[in-house]
Amino acid sequence: MSADESNIICIEDDEENIEESGVKYSDKLPVCQGSSKILCRSSSQEVIQENERKKRGKNYAVPSILDDFFGVYCLLSRSPNRYFKNRCYIGYTVNPNRRIRQHNAGKEFGGAKKTDHRGPWDMVCIIHGFPNSVSALRFEWAWQNPEKSRRLRLLNLKKRTSETAFGFRLRIACHMLNSDPWRRLSLTFRWLLPELEIPFPLDVLPPSHIAVEHGAVTKISTLIPQLQEEYDVAGTCSLCLKPILSISELLRCHANETCKSHFHMRCLSKHALNAVDEYRTSLFPIQGQCPKCGVVYLWGDLIRDQRILLAVNKFNSSSTLFNMIPRGKLIKM
């Protein structure tokens, strides 16, 4: 094994229990690293809904659903053994706080074979915001195997002499974020341990629409509205004026507290792609502008909102609220 190869573990997919978003009642996952949390601004509608819940009684449990989380992370070994120290491991998770504990606890506690007895490990960064687990797992595999990925192999990415193992992995990730199909996703690059942060390569910075954040990941839940007046019908598409028959084909304007427009997914995608002359070359836009109110949105944010609407509708499947659309912005906690 060469010196370069000794610093990078050839990673195989590790087995992990994939959690599905289910209904929970106001519970949060413990934060393993740091204390930074994702905060949400309150609106007048949120204050009204909060007051309504207080009126129903202090012991009233408001049902909620866990928002989807699909992330691909990079670990860095702090092993006292110089043979393992500073090696990197790339993995996929739906719960980074739990996953780092598993890696450091060992294989018998759910950690991966390639990290067993080679730590302790630090989870330095994670890229999240993927629309589904398949998309995240494909990103994980390409990050692990850039020389095999048809999206990256032509770049012939090699570790530079002055480059650390993590620096090389960061450069690969930046190339991926600038390559199809990942450059079209509204992802977040999160530094979990800011003290280990290093500058992005100047020749391949992340795209401007990729958010760069710091601090630990906090699982977010969405409260499910319980009142009939908090819902509306799907109605008609604001572009083609035809009925929207299913929530699976519905997208809401990002400014849904003030703009009540609903769209067919295909209609809004076509509108945004035509605006940048990409309709014949792309399936969906990176971002767009609401044709009614003019607010700028990221396509990935609308898809995440749609997934939450589908989960809310599944919860309401046995009630009169089935196939109804929540009004305004949903409350996060």
Curated annotation (Swiss-Prot):
Keyword terms of this UniProt record: DNA damage, DNA recombination, DNA repair, Endonuclease, Hydrolase, Metal-binding, Nuclease, Nucleus, Zinc, Zinc-finger
Entry GO terms, CC: Slx1-Slx4 complex
Residue span, GIY-YIG domain: 68-157
Example GO molecular function: 3'-flap endonuclease activity
Entry superkingdom: Eukaryota
Keyword flag Nucleotide-binding: no
Protein name, UniProt field: Structure-specific endonuclease subunit SLX1 homolog
Keyword Isomerase attached: no
Needed co-factor(s): a divalent metal cation
Upper taxonomic lineage: Eukaryota, Metazoa, Ecdysozoa, Nematoda, Chromadorea
